[in-house]
């Protein structure tokens, strides 16, 4: 005896394939712009490895958005790695990474905040701002770490036509502007 497959399964398969084809066309539209702009600049904030000090980076954008551990993305700025100072962190390397994409014109303010300073406090914090594609350092400085609970304004940079034009020291507090 020969078993016949019902024709409805063939029709259902045809419908599923047609729907999947339309979905693929919608996802891969020729000439469509990238959904996520590429990284243009990268900021690294680092301090002595192995310490339990938790240094937090705060970035105030020209749109008055504070990017930090509780608000990790503003569209053009993202905190990619929030370091907790080896407390609950699988790595002893103390490093925060911030990426910048499609920057808005205006001034970006960078400050650091000593959130927690247990056992072995860190003394210095290093901040480096790179052009992501060329590797060129636009800012490089080592500052004295603020005492626990304190914020330290570090530097600011100016953006025109999506490019960083100037970096300089700053005395503007970011946390004070976001509360």
Model-derived features with residue positions:
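N-terminal Sec-pathway targeting helices
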Residues: 1-18
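Intrinsic-disorder/low-complexity signal
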Residues: 21-179
